Amino acid sequence: MRFPLRFTLTQARHRARMKRLGRKRYPTVLMLEPLYTCNLACLGCSTERYSGKLSDRLPPEKCFAAVDACGAPIVNICGGEPCLYPELKELLEGLFARNKHVILCTNALKLEEKLFGVVPPTHRLLLMIHLDGMRETHDYVTNRAGVFDKALDAAKKAKQLGYNVYLNTTVFRETKVEE
């Protein structure tokens, strides 16, 4: 998968800086999981990925502390479902203010409500939408009918609005080769 050129250039600058500093090991991407709450119960996720309580989420200041301590130029927000994080707008704005590139891993069911019209498209944000196969397979894997169509509609709308959109697929035993 090819990432946007700006993401790639940022990574290259980070690696060059680390080399100049003589560091052999350093983080390049921070996987930030601010919550373990999800609106789906997919086959590929362990129970703690979708059964967490919203009240157990990390507050934005702890997220920012982790980001600042890590120093990676890219932050991948995943967990449960990031669009359920009540402080998502604050978190994204804080990451952009720190000049971070952000990958938001989402099932796309709440993009309309939580992102579109709330956080404008920017070259610093990449929406990574999970589509685990075509309609029948994806709906089976997510344990809910209609999720494929909702996710695909959200991906199309995000593109129309100017967001960077990538699709991510997990291949399961149930995935058909043709997909």
Where are the regions a protein language model picked out?
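Conserved alpha-helical substructure of the radical SAM core
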Residues: 2-123
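Soluble or luminal CAZymes and related metallo-dependent hydrolases
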Residues: 58-62, 146-150, 175-179
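Conserved radical SAM core fold
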Residues: 82, 108-113, 127-144, 173-174
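A short helix-to-beta-strand connector/capping loop
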Residues: 122-124, 162-163
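Glycine-rich S-adenosyl-L-methionine
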Residues: 142-160
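Conserved strand-turn element in the central/C-terminal portion of the radical SAM core barrel
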Residues: 154-178
